[in-house]
Amino acid sequence: MFKDFFNRTKKKKYLTVQDSKNNDVPAGIMTKCPKCKKIMYTKELAENLNVCFNCDHHIALTAYKRIEAISDEGSFTEFDKGMTSANPLDFPSYLEKIEKDQQKTGLKEAVVTGTAQLDGMKFGVAVMDSRFRMGSMGSVIGEKICRIIDYCTENRLPFILFSASGGARMQEGIISLMQMGKTSVSLKRHSDAGLLYISYLTHPTTGGVSASFASVGDINLSEPKALIGFAGRRVIEQTINEKLPDDFQTAEFLLEHGQLDKVVHRNDMRQTLSEILKIHQEVTK
């Protein structure tokens, strides 16, 4: 009896904890800042252009919300809305991933293009949306951007492009890489016509996008703390066998080293663009 008592297996006691992901932030009503973790009302955050009230972190804006923020009400006309990607390399499950992102975002591709007016001044615009395949650049992105640039050239309009991309889209291989040169040629024609191109880099702008149309603006702007670069930090450190500065590949680092003209807070975005367009309008009269 006593032998059995001492050999008896003790039952382990566990505390059951609910998954915090399920009840941390009410869906749709509240939004958590990805940087400081502060929880805010989604509506109030949207009114502040998705800039955190606590830490000033610039949370990503959707393409349509950004266009709304920089244009006169009702002035935006979208181009090539229905253009979608094919699967030229028969890459496994690529089309399924495209369809999933289309359902999630309501977009057909990772860029929205068209014309709009800001304080009565007409301009062409392209806005990348990183929710769709991380804004990766494929054939459709290249084609849509080239079409709006060519339209701006033919109609003598300034052009504003907001970049947000992880780079080239690997599922389209060399066709994706070709878009770097293709978009650059269209921008060269736009420049040769004496027209203004404003490149506005947002978080993140990397890879083939940073090495092509994002870096060749007549004026290059960026949002605070945006990640901007070509290769990843770890790859560079391993290649050169050196430790990089903590602020390497940030907008502020690029501004300090002459690769940006200005870092613009999102609340100043509309006013800054309006002032630049007014100057361009005056000198081209």
Curated annotation (Swiss-Prot):
- List, separated by semicolons, the cofactors it needs: Zn(2+)
**Binding partners and assembly:** Acetyl-CoA carboxylase is a heterohexamer composed of biotin carboxyl carrier protein (AccB), biotin carboxylase (AccC) and two subunits each of ACCase subunit alpha (AccA) and ACCase subunit beta (AccD).
Q: Which catalytic reaction applies to this protein? A: N(6)-carboxybiotinyl-L-lysyl-[protein] + acetyl-CoA = N(6)-biotinyl-L-lysyl-[protein] + malonyl-CoA
* One GO term (biological process): fatty acid biosynthetic process
The record describes the protein's role as: Component of the acetyl coenzyme A carboxylase (ACC) complex. Biotin carboxylase (BC) catalyzes the carboxylation of biotin on its carrier protein (BCCP) and then the CO(2) group is transferred by the transcarboxylase to acetyl-CoA to form malonyl-CoA.
Report the coiled-coil segments: none
Zn finger (C4-type) start-end: 33-55
CoA carboxyltransferase N-terminal domain residues: 29-285
- EC? 2.1.3.15
Q: Annotated pathway, please?
A: Lipid metabolism; malonyl-CoA biosynthesis; malonyl-CoA from acetyl-CoA: step 1/1
UniProt family annotation:
Belongs to the AccD/PCCB family.
Cofactor comment text:
Binds 1 zinc ion per subunit.
Please, which domain of life does this record's source organism belong to? Bacteria
The entry's protein name is Acetyl-coenzyme A carboxylase carboxyl transferase subunit beta
- What is its subcellular localisation? Cytoplasm
